[in-house]
């Protein structure tokens, strides 16, 4: 079984322990992203997994690729070019203080990529399953187009498509998410989501607050 995932890899800068960003004078650095994390998880379970993204041709971009590849993920399909890797700052919550995330991902290599840069005939060669999350089409309109091109070819090639709705309110509104995700659902074979994501991404009220309904 060959799996291909498509999305953005980012540099995560986390405050030590439970320090707030305002308190920190150092940050713990690592790399990840929804689709990259799925690729790594599947690879560690022994699956044959490839990952598609775009990163700059400098040491930070290469470090991101190295981090994913060291877990056994095939990174040979990663595109190179552009100016920067997206960053997010992570402040872990404690007690009643919630976790906080600040995105700095504008103008990243993948956000500035054009749809035609992704040669899906080659990228999907030999693939059995294609995975993406709702984060990917929110990156840019060009990546939305690139994703839909991939999905259309998956349908033609009878490649199974798996989507995790994974709604991110800091990236787009529910109106924009529903406009895009409802259309993309036509290509999806397996959809993964919690009740909040179903409502935010698709406008489907999947939970009415009555816990007792779980027994029905």
Regions found by a protein language model. Name each.
Residues 118, 144-149, 174-182:
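Charged helix-capping and loop-helix junction motifs
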Residues 171-216:
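Conserved phosphate/ATP/ADP-binding segment of small-molecule kinases
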Residues 136, 167-169, 197:
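Active-site-proximal loop/turn and secondary-structure-junction residues that shape catalytic pockets
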Residues 153-160:
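A short helix->loop->beta-strand "cap" motif at the edges of active sites that frequently abuts
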Residues 48-134:
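Conserved N-terminal subdomain of the carbohydrate kinase-like
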Residues 51, 161-163, 191:
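Hydrophobic faces of well-ordered beta-strands that scaffold small-molecule active sites
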Residues 1-74, 113-115:
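Glycine-rich phosphate/adenosyl-contacting loop at the front of the ribokinase-like
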């Amino acid at each position: 079984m060959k799996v291909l995932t498509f999305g953005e890899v980012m540099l995560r800068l986390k405050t030590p322990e439970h320090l707030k960003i305002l308190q920190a004078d150092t940050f713990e650095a690592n790399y990840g992203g929804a689709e990259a994390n799925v690729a790594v998880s599947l690879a560690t379970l022994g699956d044959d997994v490839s990952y598609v993204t775009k990163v700059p041709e400098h040491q930070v971009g290469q470090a991101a690729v190295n981090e994913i590849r060291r877990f056994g993920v095939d990174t040979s399909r990663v595109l190179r070019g552009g100016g920067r890797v997206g960053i997010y700052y992570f402040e872990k919550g404690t007690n009643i203080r919630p976790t906080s995330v600040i995105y700095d991902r504008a103008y990243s290599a993948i956000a500035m990529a054009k749809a035609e840069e992704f040669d899906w005939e080659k990228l999907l060669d030999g693939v059995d399953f294609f995975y993406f999350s709702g984060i990917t089409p929110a990156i840019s309109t060009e990546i939305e187009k690139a994703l839909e091109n991939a999905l259309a070819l998956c349908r033609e090639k009878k490649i199974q498509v798996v989507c995790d709705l994974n709604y991110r309110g800091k990236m787009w509104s529910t109106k924009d998410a529903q406009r895009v995700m409802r259309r993309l659902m036509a290509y999806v074979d397996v959809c993964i989501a919690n009740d909040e994501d179903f409502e935010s991404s698709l406008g489907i009220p999947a939970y009415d607050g009555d816990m007792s309904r779980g027994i029905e």
